[in-house]
A protein has these predicted regions:
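Surface-exposed acidic, glycine-flexible loop patches that form ligand/cofactor-binding
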Residues: 15-21, 65-66, 166-167
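Loop/turn elements at helix/coil->beta-strand transitions in domains of secreted/extracellular proteins
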Residues: 21-26, 69-75, 103-107
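Conserved SGNH/GDSL esterase-like catalytic core that processes O-acyl groups on lipids
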Residues: 1-54
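Extracytoplasmic/secreted proteins, especially bacterial periplasmic and envelope-associated proteins
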Residues: 9, 13, 25, 47-51, ...
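Active-site segments of SGNH/GDSL-like serine hydrolases
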Residues: 29-39, 63-94, 111-113
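Catalytic His-Asp segment of secreted/periplasmic serine-dependent ester chemistry enzymes
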Residues: 81-170
Length: 170
């Protein structure tokens, strides 16, 4: 179970960071801990339940309000699918997509599985790199990714930021 308070820790941190940094853009990837068994005011939130989805959707909107407080555009990566299908990443993606759609202009969803997934967007542990070598994308539990996965995501973001005029392609 997460050891933080949503309003006092998370939202306060988001607000403080935006106020201190005044970001030109905000980049977000969250969701790996959304299956850890949250309790809200004594109510256990079963991952995948309707109530769980309602709470996460509300929190996604609250987070977005903090990130967009000074008008910076938000680039939100979808939560990468994980090896263990008990991690209901497709449910999370639906919540994140609904949030980005609701906020409209200035909020962009980036599909992490375009670069981390196989040709159909499904989970994969390894990939063949540009040198023809088989390299690991994910760490042992199939949740977090190795540097090569992070590099793929960074390139995906860079391409989008160039396309949107935030960066200049050398």
């Amino acid at each position: 179970m997460p050891l933080w308070d949503w309003e006092e820790d998370v939202l306060a941190d988001y607000s403080r960071l935006v106020a201190e940094v005044h970001p030109d853009v905000v980049v977000v990837m969250i969701g790996a801990n959304e299956f850890e068994g949250h309790v809200l005011e004594g109510e256990a939130l079963e991952p995948g339940s309707e109530r769980w989805a309602e709470v996460l959707a509300e929190r996604a909107g609250e987070a977005m309000a903090q990130w967009r407080a000074e008008g910076a555009p938000v680039y939100w990566w979808t939560t990468p699918r994980m090896r263990d299908t008990r991690f209901l990443t497709d449910d999370l993606i639906a919540i994140w997509e609904a949030t980005t759609t609701a906020w409209g202009a200035g909020v962009t969803s980036l599909d992490s599985m375009v670069v981390l997934g196989d040709a159909s967007g499904a989970y994969r542990d390894r990939m063949v790199d540009e040198n023809g070598r088989l390299v690991d994308l994910r760490k042992a539990r199939g949740v977090h990714f190795h540097e090569v996965g992070a590099d793929l995501l960074a390139r995906q973001l860079e391409e989008r930021l160039v396309a949107d005029g935030w960066l200049v392609d050398d």
